Amino acid sequence: GAIGHRIVQGAEFFTKSEIVTDAIIDKIEEIAPLAPVHNLAHVQGLRSAKKVFGADVPNVVVFDTTFHQTMPPKAYMYGVPYEMYEKYAIRRYGAHGTSHRYVSMAAAKFLGKDPAELKMVTCHLGNGSSITAVAASAWTPAWA
């Protein structure tokens, strides 16, 4: 068995799920200013899980932002000076990616279609809400 952790913010550093190491935890903590309430709680949870369950039980992190990694620069850049992006990582990252990925794949299965053939809009409604245009099982801006 393993312990799975959904991490809200992976910034541009995490493009896939990862087996947790101390370096991974440190990086999640480093990027916490992008999602301070969530990522700092994730760090506490990761450290606690490692302490309680030990090295015999692997911990895996899944990032909500991974699904949105295919977003092109024209979609994720804001109309602010580029230096703000470089210095403070100010950009659009996308939200609720694990939910949007699941819903888009489930919709394709329900329709009996290859996800690569579909264009759809998925909605995540919960404590937070988001809408994402999906094409070929990846994020695409509605205007593309």
Identify the residue ranges that each predicted region occupies.
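Short beta-strand-loop/turn "lid" adjacent to the catalytic site in phosphate-handling enzymes
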Residues: 1-38, 58-60, 66-75
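Conserved nucleotide-sugar donor-interacting segment of glycosyltransferase catalytic cores
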Residues: 40-59
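Glycine-rich phosphate-binding loop of actin/hexokinase-like ATP-binding domains
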Residues: 69-144
